[in-house]
Amino acid sequence: MSVQREDVDIKLIAIDMDGTLLNDEQLISDENRKAIREAEDKGVYVVISTGRTLMTCRELAESLKLSSFLITANGSEIWDSNFNLVERKLLHTDHIQMMWDLRNKHNTNFWASTVNKVWRGEFPENITDHEWLKFGFDIEDDDIRNEVLEELRKNKELEITNSSPTNIEVNALGINKAAALAKVTEKLGFTMENVMAMGDSLNDIAMIKEAGLGVAMGNAQDIVKETADYITDTNIEDGVAKAIRHWVL
């Protein structure tokens, strides 16, 4: 690790939720809560940056009583501290139709996020009646997953990541956590150099790369660890709190 504490001036901590802030019971540990509160008390902004939609993360986000922004659906949406929408970028319905056809071709598990619902199992008849944020495939079989990935990559208008080794997450091209964070830092009056970003999956790589300090969880996918400046403990060992204490407090 080449970065030292004296090399960075952290004004904002960006934290992924699943596999990062949350333990395997989907809870925020007392240690993580305490470190986040101490960082905010010190004047450092804390921003949750998640692949989840607002409806699936709001309760957890509210419990932290953060003073800044919230990034959801891998950067498709930015919310202020009162959960008012600041910005939203949608997936084109043609792309949703293509991915739904691909899902049916391979008979995979899926989920798809609109602005007011997460679809699982069922799917709307009229795709154009909805505003789409993200489409996800969950595929245990490596061969099928790679085949789906290959077909998706033919379309150059998609941002393709994952939030676990067995899934694929798709947003509109250019929509990622880093792009959303850059907009947040601009609103707050500093740059990505002043950000510490923490995560565990491919949908965290962009923000980990572009942040002044990129932190991978101990349980992160290998490619995420290779990208990071620093590797903390796992999500079940208060890795978030330990990184905050090491770099900020």
Swiss-Prot record:
A single cellular component GO annotation: cytosol
Top-rank taxon: Bacteria
Pfam families with a match to the protein in the record: Hydrolase_3
Cofactor: Mg(2+)
Binding-site list for phosphate: M17, T50, G51, K177, N203
Phenotype upon gene inactivation: No visible phenotype during normal growth or under oxidative stress caused by diamide.
Annotated active site: D16
Binding site for Mg(2+): D16, D18, D200, S201
GO biological-process terms attached to the record: riboflavin biosynthetic process
Gene3D superfamilies: 3.90.1070.10, HAD superfamily/HAD-like
EC number: 3.1.3.104
GO molecular function per UniProt: 5-amino-6-(5-phosphoribitylamino)uracil phosphatase activity; magnesium ion binding; phosphatase activity
Reactions catalysed according to its record: 5-amino-6-(5-phospho-D-ribitylamino)uracil + H2O = 5-amino-6-(D-ribitylamino)uracil + phosphate
CDD domains noted in UniProt: HAD_Pase (cd07516)
Keywords: Hydrolase, Magnesium, Metal-binding, Riboflavin biosynthesis
Pathway field: Cofactor biosynthesis; riboflavin biosynthesis; 5-amino-6-(D-ribitylamino)uracil from GTP: step 4/4
Record's function text: Catalyzes the dephosphorylation of the riboflavin precursor 5-amino-6-(5-phospho-D-ribitylamino)uracil and of flavin mononucleotide (FMN) in vitro. To a lesser extent, may also catalyze the dephosphorylation of a broad range of substrates such as phosphorylated sugars and triphosphate nucleotides in vitro.
Family the entry assigns: Belongs to the HAD-like hydrolase superfamily. Cof family.
NCBIfam families in the record: HAD-SF-IIB, Pglycolate_arch, SPP-subfamily
Protein name: 5-amino-6-(5-phospho-D-ribitylamino)uracil phosphatase YcsE
